[in-house]
A protein has these predicted regions:
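Conserved core of the sugar-phosphate nucleotidyltransferase
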Residues: 1-35
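Left-handed beta-helix
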Residues: 12, 35-238
Length: 238
């Protein structure tokens, strides 16, 4: 469809013709040739525009000179409703990841009629193994999680999204958290309501997300809703 106008977060959006109760909203997904986009960004940087915001300044100017087409996304081909979230804050990003774990999930990664294509590293399938303690009690388990390839978990993991090539050792607890790739959580460590970036090491017995004041004192970012963020390649000790 031909795009004839663009409004950046208007207070009263223009309704769809013939459907006064609905408006078309940009999902923030744009496709350009690299040369065209670079030229437009340079033109904006060298020009006299009052700002450099994509929605406020760059896209409206392009629209005045070039034809722009829009794709009306509505979950076509699947029984699921369309899914869109603004993940511009830590808490919004966290909630969107937790949507993957719902029953039913807000966004179903396993819907064959609506495939989600992403990077697939060459690792073996994830392995969740329960190693018994000397007492005979299990030292781990799994409930309502997503594990990416190459991950090995022998600890307790609940309500979490785990990236590829991670390790959760026996006796460790990971709960309501997001682990990026190559994260290690040592034996007896605890990670609760946290986002751990790539390559983070949580040493045996260490804690993340259990005491927010302690997290802040260590320099970790804690969101408004209490989600602790640990930066890439950080080592978290006791």
């Amino acid at each position: 469809a031909q795009v004839t106008g663009f409004q950046e977060k208007p207070e009263h959006p223009t309704p769809v013709p013939g459907d006064e109760g609905n408006s078309l909203a940009s999902m923030g997904i744009y496709v350009f040739t690299a040369r065209f986009l670079v030229d437009e960004l340079r033109r904006n940087a060298e020009g006299v525009e009052p700002g450099h915001d994509f929605g406020h300044h760059i896209l409206p100017r392009i629209m005045g000179r070039e034809p722009i087409r829009g794709f009306t996304f509505s979950g076509r081909g699947t029984g699921a409703h369309g899914y869109w979230r603004d993940v511009g804050t830590v808490d919004a990003y966290y909630r969107a990841n937790m949507d993957l774990l719902g029953d039913p999930p807000g966004l179903d990664l396993y819907d064959r009629a609506w495939p989600i294509y992403s990077f697939q590293p060459s690792f073996p399938p994830p392995r969740v193994a329960v190693v018994p303690e000397p007492s005979g009690r299990p030292a781990g388990g799994s409930r309502h999680n997503i594990f990416a390839n190459g991950t090995v978990s022998t600890g307790w993991v609940r309500g979490s999204v785990i990236g590829f090539d991670c390790r959760v050792d026996a006796g460790a607890v990971v709960e309501d958290s997001i682990l990026f790739s190559r994260v290690t959580v040592g034996a007896g460590a605890e990670v609760r309501r946290a986002i751990l970036d790539k390559g983070v090491q949580v040493l045996p017995g260490a804690r993340v997300g259990c005491d927010l004041d302690e997290d802040r004192a260590r320099g970790f970012v804690v969101s408004e809703c209490g989600v602790t963020c640990v930066a890439k390649n950080a080592v978290v000790g006791v």
